[in-house]
């Protein structure tokens, strides 16, 4: 935040780092580096906190650990409850209860926006049937090997923003030997492979939230080294098509949580 100008913080109950993040944010506020309004804080109700009572307590815990009166974005982290089978019908009922809690907390001012994470098209379609307040976003894994075409189309049709985590395929897509086209395009555009993958997501209308614990990489992700060509595109049509074709060439690959089996 102090060196790279980071203003978006993505955390979750299950990450167990909210207290440290809250302390760092308040230190930056105290030192005059940022104001609370400058920082966009996202947190998530965990699979251990599904259902009316647990979700309400979960939100209280998030605010307490972060030391804030509100978060800018509050998400349901996962469409199933912990310790329930993925195929249990109880998951749908607990999702609905949890969403009602998020709607209430939005009304109370404890969250500025609410959304979901790791929801499939079926989960979103079900949610939209009963939601009084529509989810602002769905945070999911999305990259050229797992492009989420159907989900992106559904979200676009229903006004739900897709937010991509794991834009680098858990780091696998940065392997030049395994996926040479990413690095070839990086050489053509005179930027890093990571910047190519982030730009691919942005060109698809997806928000990207790369993470790193390495200061140099954090700076790299935010730099504008990828310049637009004479046609105004940051990736040429041919370059984008090469990236789009990776899932067909190598087979779709999912590296993170898979919610496809959750009822």
Language model features: what each stretch is:
Residues 35-49, 73-79, 141-142:
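A short, structured active-site edge motif that brings together acidic residues
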Residues 55-76, 104-108:
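CE4/NodB-like, metal-dependent polysaccharide N-deacetylase domain
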Residues 9, 71, 114:
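Glycine-centered flexible beta-alpha turn that most often forms the glycine-rich phosphate-binding loop
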Residues 79-263:
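Beta/alpha (TIM)-barrel catalytic core signal, keyed to glycine-rich beta->alpha loops juxtaposed to Asp/Glu
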